Amino acid sequence: MSFRKVVRQSKFRHVFGQPVKNDQCYEDIRVSRVTWDSTFCAVNPKFLAVIVEASGGGAFMVLPLNKTGRIDKAYPTVCGHTGPVLDIDWCPHNDEVIASGSEDCTVMVWQIPENGLTSPLTEPVVVLEGHTKRVGIITWHPTARNVLLSAGCDNVVLIWNVGTAEELYRLDSLHPDLIYNVSWNHNGSLFCSACKDKSVRIIDPRRGTLVAEREKAHEGARPMRAIFLADGKVFTTGFSRMSERQLALWDPENLEEPMALQELDSSNGALLPFYDPDTSVVYVCGKGDSSIRYFEITDEPPYIHFLNTFTSKEPQRGMGSMPKRGLEVSKCEIARFYKLHERKCEPIVMTVPRKSDLFQDDLYPDTAGPEAALEAEDWVSGQDANPILISLREAYVPSKQRDLKVSRRNVLSDSRPASYSRSGASTATAVTDVPSGNLAGAGEAGKLEEVMQELRALRMLVKEQGERISRLEEQLGRMENGDT
């Protein structure tokens, strides 16, 4: 008889979240109070954008990532809308282009100066007018340049070519009620939507047809969300009939029953899912919650595997997620969230603890880069393409103190294996046998030679220690896999 392992093996089992220090937060930001279940925040490797309170119209703030600390009340904003801004989204193919949707029924696309704003930005690059009610959803196509989707409270989905300000597709008969959210699939050939009528729909935008539909995906009356995963499955969040918050996983080929359905708690805030296709981890943030739960999605039942919960004291008003190419890979950072408080934005770093200071190939497979795979015209003609991937290895920066850390650990460690003691002793000799008087009285050449001797000895220790770490990691890997 075979017994299932009590603890499921996962490289993400020990992922932990940690807020940054106070001086790395963005203070004194008046986050929008508008009633709308949006993230209110968008971030890319260059800029942080936050929807803020504004008198006489709608505005959002765009800050260079390094502009932390207290933000001056007179700091310039993007303020061209005549009504409150409801949603913002950075273009995945240009880190200086952002789109916004507003209660004034318009979509605007903005070009942010390379070094950030020095004066209020009131003139968008283009204004897209086609909705008759407020525009609450904005999302760029993942692979086609200049293709933007907007959805409004008029229950209409519009797809635009931003480069020509042209309306490409109008889908006005597929949603009988308010649209809660829209999510493109991996190559942008389909999108899924969650609607107030409790249905999840999968739609082919170019044909204007309904590919699949699941009624009452979640039976509760509160808002739900649906997102596409990289393998084509659909992940949803919502509420049960008893108002308990739920997660579910669906196969679009068969929407009769969910592949998995989990109940979380009975809080009333909408659950906002953030998905990382490289690691198959979904982070779930509830509006008004003070926690972030994260789950790994696999092909093995029960398919949705709880990993851990990051908990803080303050409730979140909104949340932004950094694209993978903006993370610090040298610190084994696999996600970074920008949590909105009432008057500040706090980055939260998700890290996989690793002892090795080398680039972690298993954590960082090639990821979607900033280059568009298609032009808008190609996509309209029926072409599809997956995102163009880039390696994050070039972004890896070894720790500047790596040699110092390793040498200290080896010189001071009493549990060092015998095979390393000779090298350690020779290093200690190289370091301690040089009389201080000689250093003081010797010429520059003598000083240089002594320093070089010490450096060579330390390098040898580093090399040997690195080999030992590699062997131990291999042994640990075999033990975890049950090979030994």
Swiss-Prot record:
The biased composition feature labelled Polar residues covers 410-430
Which residue ranges does UniProt annotate as crossing the membrane? none
WD repeat positions in this chain?
Answer: 80-120, 130-170, 174-213, 217-260, 265-305
Q: Which gene encodes it?
A: Coro1b
Record's function text: Regulates leading edge dynamics and cell motility in fibroblasts. May be involved in cytokinesis and signal transduction.
Q: Name one Pfam family in it.
A: WD40_4
Tissue-by-tissue expression = Ubiquitous.
Which protein is depicted? Coronin-1B
Q: Provide this UniProt record's keywords sorted from A to Z.
A: Actin-binding, Coiled coil, Cytoplasm, Cytoskeleton, Phosphoprotein, Repeat, WD repeat
Could you tell me where this protein is found in the cell? Cytoplasm, Cytoskeleton; Cytoplasm, Cytoskeleton, Stress fiber
InterPro entries assigned to the protein according to its UniProt record, in alphabetical order: Coronin, DUF1899, WD40/YVTN_repeat-like_dom_sf, WD40_repeat_CS, WD40_repeat_dom_sf, WD40_rpt
